[in-house]
Regions:
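Generic structural marker for isolated residues within well-ordered, non-membrane alpha-helices
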Residues: 3, 60, 91, 229, ...
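Short polybasic/polar patches that bind polyanions
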Residues: 8, 18, 40, 65, ...
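Conserved beta-strand elements of the Class I
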Residues: 75-78, 135-137, 244-247
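Acyl-thioester C-C bond-transforming condensing/cleaving domain
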Residues: 54-73, 82-205, 268
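Claisen-condensing/thiolase-fold acyl-transfer catalytic domains that form or cleave C-C bonds
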Residues: 47, 82-84, 89, 96, ...
Length: 278
């Protein structure tokens, strides 16, 4: 009953999973294939390899299809993931499948958690600022449902209700695309707080990866939000009223609600984040 309550209040309508066990018409391949509901880390990571490598390639292909760039334009490749490991890694798969140059520079940001896409974009921007000919492909894939824990632990139930499977990417370049809209990456800022290190963590266990995600995380973020944002507004000479649309990491409905109330945002200011969450 508690699990149904948590899922019902999550604000999420659809969850995607590469694991057939979770599909109504699927077969039991991972969680109930003779290992019970607690398969070992190796079995979970083997599924990450078989399912994840294709998703990395699919995202990369879509980036090229939807952009004005050719494969010959890509000078750097950044891959991002914290839900599995293998080598040669996803960078190798993308290069081979798309026919990218063998001399392309490759970087992987691993096990940094769900915020790692932001450092990846920052790294891409720095590479472009250092090289006027740089065009960087960034691909992030996470398969969180592989690490579902079938036990009545609150942290496990909360994390399972929020995180699922998917991939995303971007092409960051020193050159403006010939057609279509684009975003400009004007700057990045980050800060560390000691308050939450016991409330949000990610570690490797014998039966998959273990997520610590306490219910205090939204309150911790709320307490630090103004002290983090105020210097940024001053640095870029803007005010909160200048921002019409916010992209807040949708790490749960409670986080979005807390950010909205703390900053006194209008009801539709987080519509993009709520759309991603749902």
């Amino acid at each position: 009953r508690l699990l149904h309550h948590i899922y019902g209040r999550s604000g999420i309508k659809t969850r995607h999973s590469v694991v057939d066990d979770f599909k109504s018409s699927g077969s039991f391949e991972l969680f109930f294939n003779g290992q019970g509901a607690t398969p070992g880390t190796k079995s979970r990571n083997d599924t990450y390899i078989s399912k994840g490598r294709q998703l990395f390639v699919d995202v990369a292909n879509k980036l090229m299809t939807d952009s004005d760039f050719d494969t010959s334009d890509i000078t750097h490749l950044i891959t991002v993931s914290c839900t599995g490991f293998y080598a040669p890694g996803p960078d190798y798969d993308i290069i081979n499948s798309l026919g990218l140059g063998s001399s392309i520079e490759r970087y992987h940001l691993g096990f940094m958690g769900c915020y790692a896409a932001i450092p990846a974009l920052k790294l891409a921007r720095q590479l472009c600022m250092a090289d006027k000919d740089a065009t960087v492909m960034v691909v992030s894939v996470e398969l969180c449902t592989l690490h579902f824990q079938a036990r009545p632990v609150m942290d496990d139930m909360i994390s399972a209700s929020v995180f699922s499977d998917g991939g995303a990417g971007a092409i960051v370049s020193s050159k403006k695309p010939a057609n279509g809209p684009y975003y400009s990456l004007d700057g990045f800022e980050s800060a560390i707080t000691e308050k939450g290190k016991e409330d949000m963590a990610w570690s490797i266990g014998d039966q998959g990866f273990n997520m610590t995600l306490s219910t205090y995380v939204p309150d911790i973020l709320s307490s630090e939000l103004h002290s983090f944002l105020d210097p940024i507004f001053e640095k870029y000479n803007i005010t909160q009223d200048d921002i019409s649309l916010w992209g807040i990491h949708p790490g749960g409905r409670a986080i979005l609600d807390k950010v909205e109330s703390t900053l006194s945002l209008k009801n539709d200011a987080l519509r993009a984040s709520r759309s991603v969450l749902s």
